[in-house]
């Protein structure tokens, strides 16, 4: 019985530690392209171990409502580090998206963001699930920067938790 409990604890601890713990600023966006094919790239500033997961969405942030992603009708893409060696700070990762599917320069992806709008949109990186997340970074490319609240799929408030790691650009289709 003791051996079973020890093994269970050992395996559980190893599984839990496989996921790197990330916080605001541990990732920054380097580029985005809303013209087909949609793509974006980012740099990581923390070590990512095998199994680490990052998620991305073009949902807008609602400051007035609930300080969360409301109307979660837009897409979510999940990237997983599948390599056996850790990714080190300074590593750049690219994601490409089309109606046929999404791919990454390293790791694997599920979901797709091929509808990233050239009429203005936003892109957020987060750790966790949409209903329980840690925001890492954001970029907004609509109008004259961030709005005070989300009013449609092309608008977004700037989340306070990543204010130092959220870039607001004027209406732009592609930025490198």
Each predicted region: which residue ranges?
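A structural motif detector for short, solvent-exposed N-terminal "entry" segments of globular domains
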Residues: 19-60, 112-119
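Acidic glycine-/aspartate-rich tracts in secreted/extracellular proteins
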Residues: 34-35, 44-50, 60-63, 98-101, ...
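Conserved beta-structured recognition patch
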Residues: 53-55, 112-176
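Short, Lys/Arg- and Gly-enriched loop/turn segments at beta-strand edges
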Residues: 99-112
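Intrinsically disordered, low-complexity Pro/Gly/Ser/Thr-rich segments with frequent PxxP/GP/PP motifs
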Residues: 74-101
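Loop/turn elements at helix/coil->beta-strand transitions in domains of secreted/extracellular proteins
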Residues: 25, 91, 131-132
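Active-site-surrounding "flap" and adjacent substrate/cofactor-binding loops of secreted or lumenal enzymes
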Residues: 52, 59-84
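Bacterial Sec-dependent N-terminal signal peptides
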Residues: 1-21
């Amino acid at each position: 019985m003791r051996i079973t409990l020890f093994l269970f604890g050992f395996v559980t601890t190893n599984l839990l530690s496989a996921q790197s713990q990330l916080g605001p600023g541990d990732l920054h966006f380097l580029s985005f392209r809303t013209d087909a094919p949609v793509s974006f790239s980012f740099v990581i500033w923390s070590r990512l171990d095998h199994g680490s997961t990052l998620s991305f969405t073009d949902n807008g942030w609602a400051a007035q409502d609930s300080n969360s992603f409301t109307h979660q009708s837009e897409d979510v893409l999940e990237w997983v580090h599948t390599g056996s060696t850790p990714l080190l700070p300074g590593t750049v990762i690219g994601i490409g998206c089309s109606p046929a599917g999404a791919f990454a320069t390293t790791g694997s992806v599920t979901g797709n963001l091929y509808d990233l709008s050239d009429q203005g949109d936003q892109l957020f990186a987060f750790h966790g699930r949409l209903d329980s997340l840690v925001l890492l970074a954001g970029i907004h490319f609509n109008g004259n920067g961030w709005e005070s609240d989300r009013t449609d799929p092309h608008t977004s408030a700037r989340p306070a938790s990543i204010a130092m790691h959220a870039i607001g650009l004027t209406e732009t289709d592609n930025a490198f």
